[in-house]
Structures are given as C-alpha cells and as structure tokens.
Amino acid sequence: GHLGELECECFNAYRSDVKFTGVASHTNNARANGMVNAISMASSFVSNLPKNQSPETTDGREGFYCPLKISGSMEEALVSLFLRDFDKKQMEKRKETVQMLAETVANLFGGKVQVTHVQQYLNMKEELDKVPFVKEVLVKAFDECGVKPVMTPIRGGTDGSRLTELGIPTPNIFTGSHNYHSASEWVSLTQMVKATDIVITLSNLITKI
C-alpha cells in the first residue's frame, strides 16, 4: 500500500457456495415434463443480490456481496461468492440474506438449493485491541523512521489477519505495492526500502521490551 499505511482492522470474510438443482428435460416437451433450469435459478439469484452492496458500489467500511463464479448445467449449477463485512453481526445478516434469497429462488422455480458458508478470515481488530502495545511499538518504529502512520481499515485480508486469529498479533504495514490484483500492479522501490527500515527498527525495539 501507500507510504505510511498501518492497518489494524480488516474484513470478516466468508465464501458462500450456492448449489441449485433443477430437473433436466428435452426442450421439445419441457413444460409437460416439468423442466427446472438450474442455470436460470443461478442467474436469478445473482441478479437479485443487493446491487448497492457490491465491491464496485461500496468503499470505506461498507461490506459487500461479490459473485465470483457461475458454473454448471441445466440440472445443477453452482454460484460461488465472497461475503465481506467489518462487523460480525452484519456478516451473520449477510449469510442469512444469501440463504433466504437462495431458498426464495429455488421455490419460485420449483427446484432445490444447498448453501454452504466457509470462513476465510476474521477482522483482526478484536484481537489486536487486547494487546495495544503491539500497535504502540509499531507506531514508534514508524516515528523513528520518519514515516507518519496512516491508520486505515483494509478492505481485504492479510497474512496478519490469519496469524492474529492464531494468536500471533500481526498488524499490516505498507510494502510499496500499488494497484493490487490488476494488470497495472506496480511497486515503489523507495517505499519498499522504507518499509524494510521500519521492520528492522521494529525488531530492535521489540528486543528492548
């Protein structure tokens, strides 16, 4: 990220897999045979996700639903999506929304649906708040290196969020990289060196605690 970024808060993250099951039939007599098209169900499900709660329509602390992939056939179709939110209670509501929407679509078409939620990572803020000295010593390392810390919540996850969950408090600092996950991703060598200086300074400070 940009010079000075210091992140102690990230999304709670889940992946949801929504599997629709239809009834295959020859198209010649589909009505008489009760065809239920799983692809149509999957398409309807995605189309009815809240349009003002997608990655491209949100920022800051707003969460979202992000469809990742639709695959399958008339008989079975799978929709995979990311659920993201900084607040745990709001995340539970998002999971409930996915379940309710999936069941509504399945009932409307006369098919079946199975929803599975998989936890990916959790907001590290809750655990980092229990050990304030971790952030304090990191801010001191920034100061000694002449870098003003810019506290921002990260709209994503980090290796640190998973380490924090495992009991190793690990805030995230800038690396000099920009435009992540795009064709124009690039890195500033100057900022990378400054990040390295901070890590070295942090290591020295920690040995004195």
Protein language model regions, located:
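His/Asp/Glu-rich mid-to-C-terminal helical/loop segments that flank catalytic regions of hydrolases
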Residues: V36-P55, K89-Q90, K95-L101, E136-E144, ...
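Conserved short beta-strand edge segments in small beta-sheet-based binding/regulatory domains
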Residues: N107-H117
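Active-site-adjacent substrate-binding region
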Residues: S40-T57, F64-C66, K112-V113, L122-P171
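Redox- and metal-dependent alpha/beta enzyme cores, enriched for Fe-S-associated oxidoreductases
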Residues: M100-L108
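Non-cysteine beta-strand/loop elements that form the S-adenosyl-L-methionine
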Residues: S16-V18, P171-G176
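Short, small-residue-enriched loops and turns at beta-alpha junctions
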Residues: L3-E5, K89, Y121-D129, G160, ...
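A short, flexible beta-alpha/helix-coil linker loop
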Residues: V23-T27, R84, Q120-N123, H178-H181
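Midchain, well-structured core segments that form catalytic/ion-binding scaffolds
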Residues: G1-E96, E103
